[in-house]
Amino acid sequence: MSEYQYNKVTPEMIEKFKEIAPKRVLVGDEINEDFTHDEMAIYGKARPEVLVEATSTEEVAAVVKLCNENKVPVTPSGARTGLVGGAVSIGGGVMISLTKMNKILGYDKENFVVKIQSGVLLNDLAQDAEKQGLLYPPDPGEKFATVGGNVATNAGGMRAVKYGCTRDYVRAMTVVLPTGEIVKLGATVSKTSSGYSLLNLMIGSEGTLGIITELTLKVIPAPKSVISLIIPYENLEDCIATVPQFFMHHLAPQALEFMEKEVVMDTEKFLGKQVYPKELEGTEIGAYLLATFDGNSEEQLEDIIEQASEVVLEAGAIDVLVADTPALKKDAWAVRGALLEAIEADTVLLDECDVVVPTNKIAEFLTYTKSLEAEADFRVKSFGHAGDGNLHIYTCSNDMEEGEFKKQVAVFMDKVYAKATKFGGMISG
C-alpha cells in the first residue's frame, strides 16, 4: 500500500451512502466475512469500513465522488474469485459491490454485440448467448467470476488459443473515474483508429483507473459442431512437443490443455468419477492433452479429427480418445474445470504462480519447477493452456506452519519468475 494518508469513513458519510443506496449499505460487523478476502486468503484479510451494494452507474459515481472529496479509499468488488488479493480493502474505506448490477441489457444481432452491466457472471452470459445462437468466446476457468472482473484483469482462458483474450471482445464500456465522473469509452463499431485507446488502457487495470459499470461486448455466431479429444502420452515432454504440430498442420483447436497424470488422478478422486485412462495396452500414461475443435458441420469435424489423430500419433501419442457425445465431452472438461478446486481441497494453504512461456519451453520450465519442489517442504502441482504457454503452478503447504510456508514460497516464486523471464516469458495473471 502507498504511504498516502487516507481518512476514515465518518458517520455523516454513512448517512449520505444510505441516501444514495437505500437498504444496501452495510457497516462494520454487518459486513460478511466473505468480503474480507478473495479466493486466495493467504494474501491477507481486511474488512472495509462500509460496503455499498450498487445497482446503477449513477450510484457508483455518487459513492466514488463522496469518497474522493473526503479522501477515503474505494475498493471495487465483483464475485471475489480473484487469486491475488486485488479485491481486499487493505486500506479500510468503502467497498462497492457490483454483483447486483447483473443485467444483460440486450443484443444487437446485426452488429454482433451484447450490452451488459459489469456484474453479470461469465456463466450467465455464456448460457444466455448460447440461447441466442451466439458465442461469447472468452472462457476463463472460473465461470462464476463477473465479466467486469474478467475485463479488469483481461482474463484469458481455455479458448484463448483460437479466439484470444477478453480484451479482444470489448467494444465499449462505461467507467466511473476516481473523481466520480462518468465516461464512455470505445464504440459499437470494430474499427476506431482515432485518438488514444483509453478503452484498452482501462482493460486489465484492475480497478486502479476507474470502476467499470457497463460493457458492450463482441459475440460471434456459435459453431454448429464441437468435439473434444483426450490424447494420452507416456510423458509430459512428448505431450508438450506435440503442440506446435497442430498449428504447423493448419489445425486450429478451440482449446488445447495439458494435464499431468497425478493432478488428473487427484481431481477424479475429488469428483468421485474416473474419466481419463491411466494405462493403455500396457503403456503407463504420464500426461494428457485435452483438445477441442469446432466447425460448421459434422463432416468438417470428422476431417479435423482424422488429421489431428495422424499428427498426434506420429508425434508420440499413445492413442486418441474421441469425446463425441455431450456426456463424454462434459465429463472430460469437468475434470479440467475442477483441477484447482481439487487442489484447494487437498491442502491447508495454497499459493499460485501464473506465467506464460514460449510453448517450446513449457516442458523444460515445468521440469525446473519440479526440481525446486525437491528442495522445499511443500508440494507443487501444475496444469495449463498448452496452446499459448499459460501455466498455473500451485504450491501446497502439506502440514507446514503458515510463516514457514510463506517464507519458502517467496523464494520459490522468485526463482520461478526469474526462470520464466529468462525463457522470454511473462507474469500472466
Question: What positions do the PLM features span?
Answer:
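Glycine-rich, histidine-containing beta strand-loop boundary motifs that form or position
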Residues: 76-80, 87, 118, 140-141
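Short, acidic (Asp/Glu-rich) active-site segment that either coordinates a divalent metal cofactor
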Residues: 84-88, 94-98, 146, 208-214, ...
